[in-house]
Amino acid sequence: LLPRDARSAVPLLLLSSATEFSGLVRDDLRPASDPARAYAVRYGSALCRWSSTEAVAEALGGSAPVWLGLIDYGGADSRTILPGLGSFHGILLALLSGESSYARCADLSSEGAQALSSRLKQALADFMTSGTPGWAEWTPQSRAVLRLDADSTACFSSLSAYPDTRESIRAAMAADASLSDAEKETVEHLYLSGFYF
């Protein structure tokens, strides 16, 4: 994944959103309640957040400190659900800048969203000035990830072990009974091939 040499041994802060893949599923899988779209978003998001965070940390093999963050805000398990969007790709930039082309669908002006924005800005400032964002570093043993969420009035964060592995995601896909095997194969070919397979 990444070449191992001294030039790549720099501290990294890797952030992803819970439903990173929600906007990448083609419109022909709409409506949002369609089982094929739900399958593509669920597992595409799991593979996307894993490959952009923990897979990178694993590939570095301890050559540099790594911190992982996962933005749950807006996703299916969030205190604030953003229907049809979830915790979409780019939500980090919207939270940091206050600018969003999703303003009609995703109100990021609530006290909770603003507190989450402040928490993210502080973590980035701390990382840039001190070399640490203020939570436990990821290691192969801890698999630490800071999960960030908000309701309408407050920000919430919790440190836990990273929720997935590539193997656990693939096993969940195989066990998922929401689609037939033929439907799964079609969805995986049309929407996940080229990303993860």
Language model: regions and residue ranges:
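Substrate-gating cap/lid region and adjacent catalytic-acid/histidine neighborhood
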Residues: 1-111, 130
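Alpha/beta-hydrolase-fold serine-hydrolase catalytic core, especially in secreted/extracellular enzymes
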Residues: 61-64, 75, 100, 104-197
